UniProtKB/Swiss-Prot annotation:
Described purpose of this protein according to its UniProt entry: Probably part of a binding-protein-dependent transport system PH1036/38/39.
Organism: Pyrococcus horikoshii (strain ATCC 700860 / DSM 12428 / JCM 9974 / NBRC 100139 / OT-3)
Family listed: Belongs to the bacterial solute-binding protein 1 family.
Compartments where located: Cell membrane
Source lineage: Archaea, Methanobacteriati, Methanobacteriota, Thermococci, Thermococcales
Region forming the signal peptide: 1-25
PANTHER family cross-referenced by the UniProt entry: ARABINOSE-BINDING PROTEIN-RELATED (PTHR43649), OSMOPROTECTIVE COMPOUNDS-BINDING PROTEIN GGTB (PTHR43649:SF29)
GO CC annotation terms, alphabetical: plasma membrane
Residues lipid-modified (S-archaeol cysteine): C26
Entry protein name: Uncharacterized ABC transporter extracellular-binding protein PH1039
InterPro entries associated with the record: Bact_solute-bd_prot1, SBP
Keywords from the named record: Acetylation, Cell membrane, Lipoprotein, Membrane, Signal, Transport
Length: 420
């Protein structure tokens, strides 16, 4: 610590010291000590941002790497994370927002929900931190209302096709198909392998893995345009072009026993990995669920035109106590945070175009290249949502075990579809 001192010529300084020494000896031993000048440094206030998202387990571990990177860059900001299901938030948030309150500063939620809350005036506009030109085309559509961006895109899961173990294919001299006929022939060949219960394991929970398989067939043989028209209700499920996809492509595979009956999806991962099944349709997050992701290969349906790219969206409620810092975090998550996230075992894809293939975790690089060469499409049942989504799941579970009831399934999907 420095003391305040005037600049005194050397000779005068020496003289002053001599006089001071003599004086101190003559004055009854009394010593006067100056108090040094202390400069007080203002400590920067540390604030806490609360973040709500859907992740837990290994997925949360990957996301926490992103949050830790933000905290490292912003030592004055600490982050608290809580896990909530979107289904629960859809009930909790509207009530809190109406009371001008929020449980967190940054919240991950469905795109359609964010748009709805934005229209009601509960969210901050993000146009100043999000440049649409920097993102995958169309990725902001679901969170933009009248030109106002209410949701920021994070990374996305893709639902790109059927996964297989490279070691399994090498052991049985199997090759990925190039045509639809090749695909059917491959299933028949796999079915004959001793110990195989079915060529394809059918993951299930509430029904969504089956919906992902179905949408992959629609996108391959009907394209993105048909998927969008089904979402909007502009094309019926009993329409000939939709029925044809079921009758000529999906249902024959079900009847031939190429798909297993629905099995709880995480258990299905283990059974497939052990070799009881050869193929498994699942999202890219499966790369973080297996022992050796480098043993994974991917087979999209031959001729696929588009794939479901399902981004995670985040919003900043108007009722945050720290709007500046919350927007700073939102911008980070939508940009450089994506670069960090795709480098983890998250199994996610970037929606920010400034992320390169080299930024990806190695087992995801080939997947990223495949997805880059097709159109991105929204998830059908998530886009429609509501009670119809549950009907869709239930009807597909019925179709999987009783494919002869296709007419009944398609009719029910039309009857239960939300009316405009």
């Amino acid at each position: 610590m420095r003391y305040a001192m005037n600049k005194i010529p050397a000779l005068l300084l020496v003289g002053a010291l001599i006089i001071a020494t003599v004086a101190s000896g003559c004055i009854g031993g009394t010593t006067t000590t100056e108090t040094p000048t202390v400069t007080k440094t203002k400590t920067q206030e540390v604030i806490t941002l609360k973040v709500i998202g859907p992740w837990s387990g290994a997925e949360l571990d990957a996301f926490m790497e992103v949050l830790k990177a933000f905290e490292k860059q912003h030592p004055n900001i600490k982050i608290e994370y809580k896990t909530y299901r979107a289904e629960d938030l859809s009930t909790i948030l509207p009530l809190q927002f109406e009371s001008h309150d929020t449980p967190a500063d940054v919240i991950f939620m469905w795109g359609w929900f964010i748009a709805e809350m934005g229209k009601k005036g509960h969210l901050m506009e993000l146009n100043n931190i999000i440049n649409p030109e920097e993102y995958v085309p169309g990725i902001l559509d679901s969170v933009t209302v009248d030109g106002k961006i209410y949701g920021a895109p994070f990374t996305a899961a893709a639902k790109p096709g059927f996964w297989y173990r490279k070691s399994f294919f090498e052991k049985h001299n199997l090759k990925p198909p190039k045509t639809w006929d090749d695909f059917v022939a491959l299933l028949e060949e796999i079915k004959k392998i001793p110990g195989i219960k079915a060529p394809i394991v059918s993951g299930d929970s509430v029904g969504w893995p089956l919906s992902d398989v179905t949408e992959h067939f629609i996108l391959t043989f009907g394209g993105k345009d048909l998927q969008l028209k089904l979402i909007k209700g502009e094309v019926k499920w009993e329409d000939p072009q939709v029925r044809k996809i079921f009758e000529e492509k999906l249902v024959p595979l079900l009847k031939a026993g190429y798909f297993s009956d629905p099995i709880e999806w995480t258990s299905a991962v283990d059974l497939w990995w052990k070799g009881e099944y050869a193929l498994y349709f699942m999202g890219t997050w499966i790369t973080g669920m297996v022992d050796d992701p480098n043993d994974l290969g991917l087979i999209p349906l031959p001729g696929v035109k588009a794939m479901v790219i399902a981004p995670d969206y985040l919003m900043v409620p108007k009722y945050t106590s720290h709007p500046k810092e919350a927007l700073e975090l939102a911008k980070f998550l939508a940009t450089e945070g994506q670069r960090i996230h795709v480098g983890t075992k998250s199994g996610k894809l970037a929606t920010w175009k400034k992320v390169s293939i080299d930024d990806y975790w190695a087992p995801m690089r080939d997947v990223a290249k495949i997805v880059a060469n097709v159109e991105s499409a929204p998830d059908l049942d998530d886009s429609v949502g509501g009670e119809w989504q549950k009907v869709f799941w239930d009807q597909l579970k019925l179709l999987w075990v009783q494919p002869d009831r296709l007419d009944e399934v398609l009719k029910t999907l039309d009857e239960k579809f939300p009316k405009k």
